[in-house]
């Protein structure tokens, strides 16, 4: 009974008391005044400069890495005249490039084009073979390459005999001493003594053997005369033989006569 009395006391006594439970206006106005005003469009608030730089978190500023562009290789005059360029082509062509000759024209042309293609691929791999040849042909009209081309052609030309003698004379004059090579020394003698007479040159030597050797060197026909004087021909040998080759000498006749006289005297005494 007492419990029932307490339950009855907890129940609201009137509808006015029940309406007080839904009365939420007592502190809401104060709470709305304390909260900051938010933007109406719903965008977040801008962070301060300290937050943007990240210094508040102990972080450095953002570093922007810009990738450097590598220079593009070009097929120009400097690349052609460098060691991997035309100088390498000239060296390897002398050692490795061989042609079969007449009757093998097509195979020789194919071998030459293949040789050029391998060289151009090593020199400038970016370009195709036809494009590389067009670039090289255009660069060949420059003054620098034309001068180098003329110099290379002059190097491959065979030298004349006079130029070789001049080189020998220059080398002997620069050395300042007599060369040990007899060919070089003899060539220098002929070139240096062209303006002198043969008698003056032969007179510089005291002995007859040296004079004879110099005269033979200056006059090649003298060697033939010298040989004729040293060696006799068959005709000369026959001409020099005496006619009375089988007849004995006078001394032999006297000896024979004395022997005959002695024989006669011995026979007479017997």
From Swiss-Prot:
Subcellular location: Nucleus
Gene Ontology MF terms: DNA binding
A Gene Ontology cellular-component term: replication fork protection complex
Main location: nucleus
Source taxon at top rank: Eukaryota
Bridged cysteine pairs (disulfide): none
Residue segments, region Disordered: 1-20
Record key words, sorted: Cell cycle, DNA damage, DNA repair, DNA replication inhibitor, Meiosis, Nucleus
GO biological process, one term: DNA repair
Subunit structure: Component of the fork protection complex (FPC) consisting of tof1 and csm3.
Family: Belongs to the CSM3 family.
Function: Forms a fork protection complex (FPC) with tof1 and which is required for chromosome segregation during meiosis and DNA damage repair. FPC coordinates leading and lagging strand synthesis and moves with the replication fork. FPC stabilizes replication forks in a configuration that is recognized by replication checkpoint sensors.
Protein name: Chromosome segregation in meiosis protein 3
Classification of source organism: Eukaryota, Fungi, Dikarya, Ascomycota, Pezizomycotina
